Every structure is written in C-alpha cells, then in structure tokens.
C-alpha cells in the first residue's frame, strides 16, 4: 500500500515551533533538529543526509559519490537553499564529526515531536513527500525540475532530452525553502 502523506500548513507550523522549542530547551538536540530541518528544506533522502560528509559539501549543494540511485556512476547533487545552508553553517563548529549532520537518524526526536504536534502518522520520509508537494503546488516548479532536486531516477529518460541548468536548480530550491518557511520565525541559531 502506497502512502500519500504530507504535512498540512498547520502541522508544518506546529512542527517548526516544537523543534525550535526543544532546541531552545536542550542544545544537545542541535544535530537531531538540524537533521530534520535539512530533510524538510532539501527534499533529500534520510540516508543521503546521514552519509554526507564535510568533504561532500560545496556551499550551494552536497555532492554524493555513493547514493541510493547510483547505477551509472553519476554523483547525486543535493541542492541547498539558504535555509539549508544556514542550518549546516550552524554545525560548522562541530566539524570534529565526519558527517555534516553528525548522526545517522533523528528518529527518537522525530517520534516525540510528531506526537506533540498530533501528527503521529507522519513519518520522516513524509517530509520528502511534503517537499515535493510544496514544490509542485505552492512554488509552481515543474515536475521534471522537482524530480531533479529530489534525485528521482525515474525521470532519467526525460532527462536525456531535457536538461536543467544548475542556475535553475539553485533558483528552484530557494523558492521551495521560502515557501516552506512562510509563517515561520527561525531562531537565531539558524539565521
């Protein structure tokens, strides 16, 4: 059974408020909160972010040599909007960890956040569905371009005939981040 679950606008606000409240109360949650925020803002897969190292980070994007859809030896570019970059920059003092986000899975925090926000059926992977939904519906980004940002290989045949410039991906990821952040005040940690 395929699930089609993404957060509602009201759930989005509650999730951000709860993440920021918890971070303010307990700074040891910085890596877990940051992981969830980059999932929300980038549309990346959890496994991609968990494995991303500081060497993979190139400012505007993370480039992975090994990733889920690597069947032809091509790297996967995860484009980062200004919101994602701010979150990652907040972790730069933590470079003693090999991976950017410093943890493999923020599941424990996520499970308690989604319960507190009364959206207990919302999985971490559903944040990726939310990204795609916002991209297509609110930010008016074409399906092919959303697929490119999310690393979907099912559009590979279309990509042979249509090419998306880096500039377009950079603009699109910024639009999505701004749309996700509408109505949300970031704490100073991420500004």
Task: Locate each region found by the language model.
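Conserved tyrosine-mediated DNA breakage-rejoining catalytic core shared by Y-recombinases
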Residues: 9-14, 18, 42, 51-90
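Active-site/catalytic core of tyrosine-dependent DNA strand-transfer enzymes
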Residues: 10-13, 79-120
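Short basic/aromatic active-site micro-motif
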Residues: 29-33, 103-107, 120-139, 148
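Short, polar N-cap/turn motifs at the start of nucleic acid-interacting alpha helices
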Residues: 55-61, 121, 140-162, 185-191
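C-terminal secondary-structure termini that scaffold catalytic or DNA-interacting sites
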Residues: 70, 94-96, 156, 171-191
């Amino acid at each position: 059974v395929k699930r089609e679950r993404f957060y509602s606008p009201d759930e989005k606000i509650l999730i951000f408020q709860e993440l920021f409240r918890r971070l303010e109360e307990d700074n040891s949650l910085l890596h877990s909160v940051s992981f969830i925020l980059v999932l929300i803002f980038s549309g990346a897969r959890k496994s991609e972010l968990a494995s991303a190292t500081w060497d993979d980070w190139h400012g505007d994007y993370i480039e992975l040599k090994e990733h889920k859809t690597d069947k032809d030896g091509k790297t996967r570019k995860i484009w980062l909007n200004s919101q994602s970059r701010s979150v990652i920059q907040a972790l730069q003092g933590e470079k003693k960890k090999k991976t950017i986000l410093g943890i493999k899975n923020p599941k424990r925090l996520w499970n308690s956040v989604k319960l507190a926000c009364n959206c207990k059926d919302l999985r971490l992977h559903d944040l990726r569905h939310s990204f795609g939904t916002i991209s297509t519906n609110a930010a008016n980004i074409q399906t092919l371009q959303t697929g490119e940002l999310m690393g979907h290989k099912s559009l590979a045949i279309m990509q042979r005939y249509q090419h998306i410039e880096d500039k377009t991906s950079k603009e699109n990821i910024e639009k999505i981040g701004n749309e996700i952040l509408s109505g949300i005040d970031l704490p100073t940690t991420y500004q």
